[in-house]
């Protein structure tokens, strides 16, 4: 299953890593370990942040991914199940059926 992980690096930790010239190597190491389908970096509430789309076959993998981000970057994370438009299309009949049961 595809998940989007949003990670927020505390400003102090990000600054320390940037000053030590280790921020890029830490992020590259995490990218090699997690092998995201897509990765984007930005800011959230003024802090360095990233959006990683990863495939997770077993929910138990989430803990290992979280620890990688906690230990490597001191990051706080959010994990959300995401779908492509095609996957959403496949889910639509079940969504509509559930909505009709709720109304019924």
Question: Where are the regions that the model predicts?
Answer:
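Conserved, structured core segments of small domains
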Residues: 1-104
């Amino acid at each position: 299953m595809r998940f989007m992980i949003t990670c927020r690096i505390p400003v102090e930790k990000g600054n320390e890593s940037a000053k030590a010239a280790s921020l890029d190597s830490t992020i590259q190491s995490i990218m090699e370990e997690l092998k995201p389908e897509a990765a984007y970096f930005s800011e959230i509430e003024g802090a360095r942040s990233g959006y990683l789309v990863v495939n997770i076959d077993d929910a138990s993998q989430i803990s290992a991914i979280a620890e990688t981000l906690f230990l490597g970057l001191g990051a706080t994370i959010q994990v959300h199940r995401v779908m492509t438009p095609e996957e959403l299309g496949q889910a639509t009949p079940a969504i509509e059926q559930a909505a009709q049961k709720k109304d019924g």
